[in-house]
C-alpha cells in the first residue's frame, strides 16, 4: 500500500505539465499584446509627445520582463518539479537550464517582480500629476514591500546556504 501511494504521489507531478504548457500560451498572448502595442505606436510616433513615447516604451519593457519571468518559471519549474528537459545536443540550450533549484528560482522570481514593479512605478511617476497622492503612496508602499520581501528572501537563503 505504501509503495502504491508513493508511486501515485510521484506520478501526480505530471499534473503540473499542462500548467506549464498553459504558461507558454500566456507567453503567446503577451507577445501578441506586445506587438499590438508596437503596431499601435509606430504610425503615431511623430505625433507622440516624448513623455508619452517613454510611457509606451516602459510598457514594452514591462511586458518583456514579464515574458522573461514566464520563461524562467516555465522551464525551471518544469525541470524542478516534472521532468528534465531533453534538448538535443545540436540545439541551443539556455545556460541556466538544469542549474536552478527551487530556492534560486524563488529568488530570481522575486528579483523579477521587483524589476517589474520598478518599471510600473516609474510609469506612474511619469504621470504623477494625474495620480492622486494616496494612490501614489500605495504604489510606493507596495513596491517597497516587494523590495523588502526580495531582500529578506535573499538574506534567508544566504543564511541557510552558509549554515549547510
Swiss-Prot record:
Its main location: membrane. GO terms for cellular component: plasma membrane. It holds the Pfam family UPF0114. The chain crosses the membrane at residues 10-32, 53-75, 136-155. It is a multi-pass membrane protein. It comes from the Bacteria. It is found in: Cell membrane. Keywords: Cell membrane, Membrane, Transmembrane, Transmembrane helix. HAMAP family: UPF0114. Belongs to the UPF0114 family. This is UPF0114 protein YqhA. It comes from Salmonella typhi.
Amino acid at each position: 500500500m505504501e509503495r502504491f501511494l508513493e508511486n501515485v504521489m510521484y506520478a501526480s507531478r505530471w499534473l503540473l505539465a499542462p500548467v506549464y504548457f498553459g504558461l507558454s500560451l500566456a507567453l503567446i498572448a503577451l507577445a501578441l499584446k506586445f506587438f499590438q502595442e508596437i503596431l499601435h505606436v509606430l504610425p503615431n510616433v511623430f505625433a507622440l509627445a516624448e513623455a508619452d513615447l517613454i510611457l509606451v516604451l516602459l510598457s514594452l519593457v514591462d511586458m518583456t520582463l514579464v515574458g522573461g519571468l514566464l520563461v524562467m518559471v516555465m522551464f525551471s519549474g518544469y525541470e524542478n518539479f516534472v521532468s528534465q528537459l531533453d534538448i538535443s545536443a545540436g540545439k541551443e540550450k539556455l545556460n541556466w537550464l538544469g542549474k536552478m533549484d527551487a530556492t534560486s528560482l524563488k529568488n530570481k522570481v522575486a528579483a523579477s517582480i521587483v524589476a517589474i514593479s520598478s518599471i510600473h512605478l516609474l510609469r506612474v511617476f511619469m504621470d504623477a500629476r494625474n495620480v492622486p497622492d494616496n494612490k501614489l503612496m500605495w504604489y510606493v508602499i507596495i513596491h517597497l514591500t516587494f523590495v523588502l520581501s526580495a531582500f529578506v528572501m535573499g538574506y534567508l537563503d544566504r543564511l541557510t546556504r552558509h549554515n549547510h
